[in-house]
């Protein structure tokens, strides 16, 4: 009796081992087939640096930063790469350094659905939450990265070029991930998929002199016809490229795609041969997707945290995690860019970004000095990370200035779009600058003998109207505004 029972038991165990092995291989086969020696350094973190404990911050996030990566390369290959490759990608050691520095500082990733709910005002998230993203759908965005995510308890989003990924089955030598690999990634629970492009992630001929440019941001030059595609053709091509990318992912994986990253970060704002490119692209993407992602430099002085329920909460800023940043650098960049809460009191020039100005403190720490920078004839600076302020006033005591006028600025989008309270001898004005055009919305005469020092104040009242005053003289704008930096 014992022997047959033992044989059945042995057979059962053998079958369990066999099917268990097949199950593991089903999910791990792509990792095995695509293994490269430098991946060992990533997998070693699962043993030596595993840290899945999620330290939850009791404070609520006032905004969410989004980090952007592309490929993660072997250290030696990265060092010997071209300048453009180094600019776009990062090395494995640098990637590990940056992510582990973020984890040690208390930063945690969120899923794409968490981010979507946060931006629509449906969900609050802890402070020090961030969205981790990768572009293109390359194999070197996944295989050396996934073990590190696993060791940290992190998640990521992959924006894919559908023509490069979904149109082919698995191939060991392919630069891009296949549809089978993408499905395996999503099954892990660590990866979300979103749209980056269909066939428009490329360069096209943009002039009769064989000039080239990003396909999405440029009208194509037709050499046979000696003319550009018409605006109607360009508009249709832009819209179709976005619809195609969304449809391809939805048909393949059967979920709704709401997020899109502009190819090369270009939405017509630069390097375009057509003045209306930006408005056409922005209009098209808003028809197809709920959110579109662009790139911003952390050194621009602009707020790159993304905030819910703002006028631009569908237009998502991403910061490229440059390979030049140490782990401490990246942590410092994110921490220093956290939104500033009211009330705000000036303490040091480090709170101020010199857009086109040299910024320094008065020797006794009693104030701020702005001086012109380079060949500029004016000096301009903003309070860092103040874009979410509302129903506030900002007062600056002006002791002296050399020039024709001095202004306090609100709703600062960029140097071509803002509101200002401007004092010049004899007048106090509310100015609006929009797309390089400066207009005086309202003005009041003041005493010609009004002398400095004086308190110059700009504010945004609860009706979101600009309030401006100098001493006892004040004015209020007729129009309302949204968002911006102060």
Residue ranges and their predicted role:
Residues 25-129, 314, 318, 323, ...:
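N-terminal pre-catalytic segment of deacetylase/amide-hydrolase enzymes
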Residues 49-54, 115-118, 141-146, 170-186, ...:
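Alpha-helical scaffolding within the catalytic cores
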Residues 67-74, 128-130, 150-267:
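Metal-dependent polysaccharide deacetylase catalytic core of the NodB/CE4 family, i.e.
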């Amino acid at each position: 009796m014992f022997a047959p029972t033992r044989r059945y038991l042995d057979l059962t165990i053998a079958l369990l081992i066999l099917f268990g092995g097949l199950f593991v291989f089903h999910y791990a086969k792509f990792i095995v087939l695509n293994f490269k020696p430098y991946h060992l350094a990533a997998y070693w973190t699962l043993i030596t640096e595993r840290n899945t404990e999620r330290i939850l911050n009791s404070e609520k996030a006032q905004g969410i930063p989004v980090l952007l990566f592309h490929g993660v390369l072997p250290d030696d290959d990265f060092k010997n790469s071209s300048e453009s490759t180094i600019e776009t990608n990062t090395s494995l050691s640098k990637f590990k350094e940056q992510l582990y520095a973020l984890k040690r500082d208390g930063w945690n990733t969120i899923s794409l659905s968490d981010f979507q709910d946060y931006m629509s005002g449906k969900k609050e998230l802890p402070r020090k939450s961030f969205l981790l993203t990768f572009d293109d759908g390359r194999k070197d965005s996944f295989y050396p990265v996934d073990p590190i995510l696993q060791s940290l308890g992190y998640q990521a989003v992959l924006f894919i070029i559908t023509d490069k990924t979904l149109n082919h089955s698995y191939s060991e030598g392919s630069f891009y991930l296949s549809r089978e690999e993408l499905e395996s990634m999503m099954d892990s629970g660590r990866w979300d998929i979103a749209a980056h492009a269909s066939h428009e992630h490329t360069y096209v001929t943009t002039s009769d002199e064989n000039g080239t440019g990003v396909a999405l941001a440029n009208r194509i030059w037709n050499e046979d016809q000696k003319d550009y595609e018409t605006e109607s053709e360009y508009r249709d091509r832009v819209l179709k490229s976005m619809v195609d990318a969304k449809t391809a992912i939805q048909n393949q994986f059967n979920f709704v795609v709401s997020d899109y990253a502009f190819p090369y970060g270009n939405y017509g704002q630069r390097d375009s041969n057509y003045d209306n490119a930006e408005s056409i692209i922005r209009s098209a993407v808003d028809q197809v997707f709920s959110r579109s992602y662009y790139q911003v430099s952390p050194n621009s002085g602009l707020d790159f945290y993304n905030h819910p329920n703002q006028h631009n909460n569908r237009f998502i800023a991403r910061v490229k995690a440059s390979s030049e940043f140490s782990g401490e650098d990246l942590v410092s960049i994110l921490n220093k860019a956290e939104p500033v809460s009211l009330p705000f009191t000036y303490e040091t020039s480090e709170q101020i970004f010199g857009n086109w100005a040299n910024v320094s403190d008065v020797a006794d720490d009693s104030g701020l000095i702005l001086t012109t920078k380079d060949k500029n004839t004016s000096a301009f600076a903003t309070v860092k990370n103040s874009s979410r302020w509302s129903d506030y006033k900002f007062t600056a005591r002006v002791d002296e200035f050399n020039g024709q006028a001095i202004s306090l600025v609100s709703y600062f989008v960029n140097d071509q779009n803002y509101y200002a309270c401007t004092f010049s001898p004899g007048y106090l004005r509310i100015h609006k600058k929009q797309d390089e055009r400066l207009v005086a919305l309202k003005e009041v005469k003041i005493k010609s003998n009004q002398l400095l020092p004086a308190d110059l104040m700009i504010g945004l009242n609860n009706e979101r109207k600009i309030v401006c005053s100098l001493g006892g003289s004040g004015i209020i704008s007729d129009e309302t505004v949204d968002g911006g930096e102060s």
